[in-house]
Amino acid sequence: MTATPSSKAWIKPALAAVLIAGAGAVAYFSLNQRASAPEITFVSIKGEKISPESLRGKVVMVNFWATSCTTCVGEMPKMVDTYNKYKAQGLEFVAVAMSYDPPNYVVNYAETRQLPFKVALDVTGDAAKAYGNVAMTPTTFVIGKDGKILKRYLGEPDFPALHKLLEKSLQG
C-alpha cells in the first residue's frame, strides 16, 4: 500500500512543531543557565593580585576599558559614582585596561582621576579572552554573589537599569 499525499499532510506541520518546541526549550534553558565568571586573577596597577577567591560572595563589576576609548573615558565618572554609591553595601569593582593600552597611560589616568576602585592591567590579553574574547570597549560585566554573570553591557550601560540590578543583587 502506498501513502497518498493527504495521509502525509500532517508530517510537515508536526515536524515543524517539534522543531519549534525544541528550539524554544533550548533558548529557555540557555537564557536561564547563567555562565560562571571566569576563574582569572587580575593584577592591579599597584602589583596587587585580585583573585577569584577574594571576590567570592560579593557582587562585582568588571569593566574592560582603554584610555584611548572616548566612551570609556566618558562613562568613567558615572562608574566612579556607581561604585561610591554601592561600595558600602559590598560592591567590588575592577577596571581592566585592555592589552593594547600602555601601562603608563593607565597608571597616569587612574592616579590623576583618583579612581577609587581597583584598576588592573591585562598586558597579555588573557582576561579579555577568558571573558569571551572581549574586543569592544567598554564592556562591563556584573557578577552576582554566586559567581554567575548577571549581565554583560557592550558600550555604556543604562545606568538607572544597572543601579536597579545592583540594588537587587546586593540585597539578595
Residue ranges of predicted features:
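N-terminal targeting signals for export/organelle localization
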Residues: 1-43, 172
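Short loop/turn microsegments at loop-to-beta-strand junctions
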Residues: 37-38, 60, 137-138
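Short active-site neighborhood of thiol/selenol oxidoreductases, capturing the structured segment around
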Residues: 51-70
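Active-site acidic short loop of glycosyltransferases
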Residues: 56-58, 88, 116
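C-type cytochrome heme c attachment motif
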Residues: 67-74, 136
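Structural microenvironment flanking redox-active thiols in thiol-disulfide oxidoreductases
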Residues: 73-113, 123-130
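Thiol/disulfide oxidoreductase modules built on the thioredoxin-like
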Residues: 108-116, 123-167
